[in-house]
């Protein structure tokens, strides 16, 4: 009887499975080669860095590999020594140097002016001041709340002017003498006096 395991797809004795294993092994070998080559390159770079750090001669400074960080190690003492040499008279001042110094002074002045302008403009109020050319600008006219308060005060003033002082004196009405008064006068004197009194007269009730 034949081996039934050969019919299984996972059987390691099959040719296709052996081929897959061999391909995976070849990939691992290639990756290991690349890793070793990269390690050798890194070691060579480190050795070059060591040799370049040991070399201090001026002639071989330019041969040094550029890493982009040279500006961190630049010494500014050379410019100071040159200025001292000019002051001591060791070097002569030419017209080109004067022109360069004048250009530098102009650039410094322009930078200072820009800084002062930037310090002045700190908000929208400064921009408004610069447009109107006034140092102290009254911005209350642009404020809606200020307008509302001013209108309210003006309205109150007009109301106070229109109000007139009223007198609390009541008009005095004299009793009228007519037919009714004669009728009460002809009778009892006490009754006529009572009817024509201040509390019962219709003119005093109103």
Curated annotation (Swiss-Prot):
<dbReference type="Pfam" id="PF12542">
    <property type="entry name" value="CWC25"/>
</dbReference>
<feature type="coiled-coil region">
    <location>
        <begin position="17"/>
        <end position="63"/>
    </location>
</feature>
<comment type="similarity">
    <text>Belongs to the CWC25 family.</text>
</comment>
<comment type="function">
    <text>Involved in pre-mRNA splicing.</text>
</comment>
<dbReference type="InterPro" id="IPR022209">
    <property type="entry name" value="CWC25"/>
</dbReference>
<dbReference type="InterPro" id="IPR019339">
    <property type="entry name" value="CIR_N_dom"/>
</dbReference>
<keyword id="KW-0508">mRNA splicing</keyword>
<feature type="compositionally biased region" description="Low complexity">
    <location>
        <begin position="186"/>
        <end position="206"/>
    </location>
</feature>
<feature type="region of interest" description="Disordered">
    <location>
        <begin position="165"/>
        <end position="206"/>
    </location>
</feature>
<keyword id="KW-0747">Spliceosome</keyword>
<dbReference type="InterPro" id="IPR051376">
    <property type="entry name" value="CWC25_splicing_factor"/>
</dbReference>
<dbReference type="GO" id="GO:0000398">
    <property type="term" value="P:mRNA splicing, via spliceosome"/>
</dbReference>
<keyword id="KW-0539">Nucleus</keyword>
<dbReference type="GO" id="GO:0005684">
    <property type="term" value="C:U2-type spliceosomal complex"/>
</dbReference>
<dbReference type="Pfam" id="PF10197">
    <property type="entry name" value="Cir_N"/>
</dbReference>
<keyword id="KW-0175">Coiled coil</keyword>
<comment type="subunit">
    <text>Associated with the spliceosome.</text>
</comment>
<protein>
    <recommendedName>
        <fullName>Pre-mRNA-splicing factor CWC25</fullName>
    </recommendedName>
</protein>
<keyword id="KW-0507">mRNA processing</keyword>
